[in-house]
């Protein structure tokens, strides 16, 4: 994290979209494996493209602050220690989302077995 980013955090100033976009892609490059990076880069590019013409200030603040938290988590590697056993979250999912989560879990397990 450079000095400007630290100063912006101290003053609770949001990072402008383009530097934030670059920061997230850089974090992917340094902290993710090749497959995760490819998937993450594709998702980040699509999300920033979708939000390019958003004019609602509240939506922009939410969008940028969420991506800043994501970049912070990647850079601090705090995401590796997190455990996702939140039963409230699981209970809030609908049947389709639970099915998708199950399929994703199965695919990840199969991928680990093949490595």
From Swiss-Prot:
The keyword Cell membrane does not apply. Pfam families: Complex1_LYR_2 (PF13233). Its main location: mitochondrion. One of its GO terms (biological process) is succinate metabolic process. It comes from the Eukaryota. InterPro entries: SDHAF3/Sdh7 (IPR008381). GO terms for cellular component: mitochondrial intermembrane space; mitochondrial matrix; mitochondrion. It is found in: Mitochondrion matrix. Keywords: Chaperone, Mitochondrion, Transit peptide. The keyword Mitochondrion applies. Belongs to the complex I LYR family. SDHAF3 subfamily. Interacts with sdh2 within an sdh1-sdh2 subcomplex. Plays an essential role in the assembly of succinate dehydrogenase (SDH), an enzyme complex (also referred to as respiratory complex II) that is a component of both the tricarboxylic acid (TCA) cycle and the mitochondrial electron transport chain, and which couples the oxidation of succinate to fumarate with the reduction of ubiquinone (coenzyme Q) to ubiquinol. Promotes maturation of the iron-sulfur protein subunit sdh2 of the SDH catalytic dimer, protecting it from the deleterious effects of oxidants. May act together with SDHAF1. This is Succinate dehydrogenase assembly factor 3, mitochondrial.
